[in-house]
Amino acid sequence: MSTRSVSSSSYRRMFGGPGTASRPSSTRSYVTTSTRTYSLGSALRPTTSRTLYTSSPGGVYATRSSAVRLRSGVPGVRLLQDSVDFSLADAINTEFKNTRTNEKVELQELNDRFANYIDKVRFLEQQNKILLAELEQLKGQGKSRLGHLYEEEM
């Protein structure tokens, strides 16, 4: 955690750009942690984006962010929006899309196999009905027909 003070004019605080204001400048303190920057003793008024300088072992980094302030009558600590790293979210999203695509392909293959089994069962049911009809026809003819067929075969 590091603490630093920034001196800026009220114009710069209000409009965010470099300017010459007739008002005296004021000093503002910022506390920077590993993930957030807090402004100490801030007044509650609209804020434009500002450049924040964060020091780390690799050097000094500048980031633009807009201040988010609580709307109450008491001045307090305000939080600044963090920049979001979408690379991890993109990787997870890509992995999810790949998994989802693979699952869809597997389900389509299983659905095709199931449809083939259903077609085979319907075909076998039709064959069974035909065989049952032939059996009933043969039963209805009686022994004379069966005997006649037997003799023809001999």
From Swiss-Prot:
Residues 2-95 are annotated as: Head. The modification Phosphothreonine is found at residue 20. InterPro entries: IF_rod_dom, Intermed_filament_DNA-bd, Intermediate_filament. Glycans are attached at residues 7, 33-34. Keywords: Acetylation, Cell membrane, Coiled coil, Cytoplasm, Cytoskeleton, Glycoprotein, Intermediate filament, Isopeptide bond, Membrane, Nucleus, Phosphoprotein, Ubl conjugation. The modification N-acetylserine is found at residue 2. The modification Phosphoserine is found at residues 5, 7-10, 25-26, 34, 39, 42, 49, 55-56, 66, 72, 83, 87, 144. The modification N6-succinyllysine is found at residues 120, 129. It is found in: Cytoplasm; Cytoplasm, Cytoskeleton; Nucleus matrix; Cell membrane. Residues 96-131 form a coiled coil. GO terms for biological process: cellular response to lipopolysaccharide; cellular response to muramyl dipeptide; intermediate filament organization; positive regulation of epithelial cell migration. The keyword Protease does not apply. Residues 1-13 have a biased composition (Low complexity). It comes from the Eukaryota. PROSITE patterns: IF_ROD_2 (PS51842). The central alpha-helical coiled-coil IF rod domain mediates elementary homodimerization. Vimentins are class-III intermediate filaments found in various non-epithelial cells, especially mesenchymal cells. Vimentin is attached to the nucleus, endoplasmic reticulum, and mitochondria, either laterally or terminally. Plays a role in cell directional movement, orientation, cell sheet organization and Golgi complex polarization at the cell migration front. Protects SCRIB from proteasomal degradation and facilitates its localization to intermediate filaments in a cell contact-mediated manner. Homomer assembled from elementary dimers. Identified in complexes that contain VIM, EZR, AHNAK, BFSP1, BFSP2, ANK2, PLEC, PRX and spectrin. Interacts with BCAS3. Interacts with LGSN. Interacts with SYNM. Interacts (via rod region) with PLEC (via CH 1 domain). Interacts with STK33. Interacts with LARP6. Interacts with RAB8B. Interacts with TOR1A; the interaction associates TOR1A with the cytoskeleton. Interacts with TOR1AIP1. Interacts with TOR1AIP1. Interacts with DIAPH1. Interacts with EPPK1; interaction is dependent of higher-order structure of intermediate filament. Belongs to the intermediate filament family. This is Vimentin. The gene is VIM.
